[in-house]
Amino acid sequence: MTKPLCIALVAGEASGDILGSGLMRALKVRHPDIRFIGVGGPLMEAEGMQSYFPMERLSVMGLVEVLGRLRELLARRKLLVQTLINEKPDVFIGIDAPDFTLNIELQLRRAGIKTVHYVSPSVWAWRQKRVLKIREGCDLMLTLLPFEARFYEEKGVPVRFVGHPLADTIPLESYRAAARAGLGLAQEAPVVALMPGSRGGEVGRLGGLFFDAAELLLAQRPGLRFVLPCASPQRRAQVEQLLQGRNLPVTLLDGQSHVALAACDAVLIASGTATLEALLYKRPMVVAYRLAPLTFWILKRMVKSPYVSLPNLLAQRLLVPELLQDDATPEALARTLLPLIDDGQAQTAGFDAIHRILRRDASNQAADAVLSLLGQSSSQ
């Protein structure tokens, strides 16, 4: 009787927990007696993982927070590596969190354990030398986006493009009328979604700018309505403060970014993963971003890509306008977005084509790739 497969996984944040649980579910269909060890969140635990420690201990953002927790993070990683070497899983899968997981992969591969990294870090854009560490530490890279796979192929890293789970869950056609009815918005009114980011710094830099642009749009289209999904109670309080003294017809939502995107005609949006959601909902957009001047100056010299937004990176052309730093003025944002409220067909046709490329049943693709690496059958 053959020994059940043992799969080790480590996820460091909520998005990784979603990906990990989907992969675990797909693997269980193929091998019902499979065993999972490692670190995950509530979704991965619901699929049968007993997490060595709470995933939240790895969820740190920003240099100051990382430095404050560095001793703990290094100690946890050292203990995790030793535990996994002793357990000898059939494969280790690091899910995103590259600053934590890539080093684990390198040490485990040297110890003779096969390694997979799920979700590429942005090595194609900056710090490209990281690909050398990935090539040394990783038996297989699973990417969510096709241009990432092409990059790894050129660098000699074994890779499989599995598609994006969001493209699987968001339908090819979304229904604006139902979303508007749920929000109490008139069906005939033009609606713009304002999405200035999910972090305090982003909202601080972009919130007032977006509201200035919204006032200019409203002056030209008096019937215009706005929706703004707030990522957290803290962001909602921040947005409410920025709105004081303004007479904008804006509906604030707690979360519900997908509802806002389904309901709107066009989006004014911060560069980031939300632009992919807007693309999948086929909503024409203008992308804006501002950073601290020194940060922007440094990144401009480090980043190798001609584009910053995911829609343009996926299209490999300027599909959506990008207004960055000093170019992101209220006047420029309003002027660029206004025609898209009524006619964004040039963008949305491209969005539909990209959605179909990304819609590949990512969890099942990833499961098949992992089992293929192990020389196992992926028959369901």
From Swiss-Prot:
Cellular component annotations (GO), alphabetically ordered: membrane
Name of this chain's protein: Lipid-A-disaccharide synthase
Organism: Pseudomonas savastanoi pv. phaseolicola (strain 1448A / Race 6)
Reactions accelerated catalytically: a lipid X + a UDP-2-N,3-O-bis[(3R)-3-hydroxyacyl]-alpha-D-glucosamine = a lipid A disaccharide + UDP + H(+)
Enzyme class (EC, first level): transferase
Entry's Gene Ontology molecular function annotations: lipid-A-disaccharide synthase activity; phospholipid binding
Gene behind the chain: lpxB
Entry's Gene Ontology BP terms: lipid A biosynthetic process
InterPro entries xref list: Glyco_trans_19
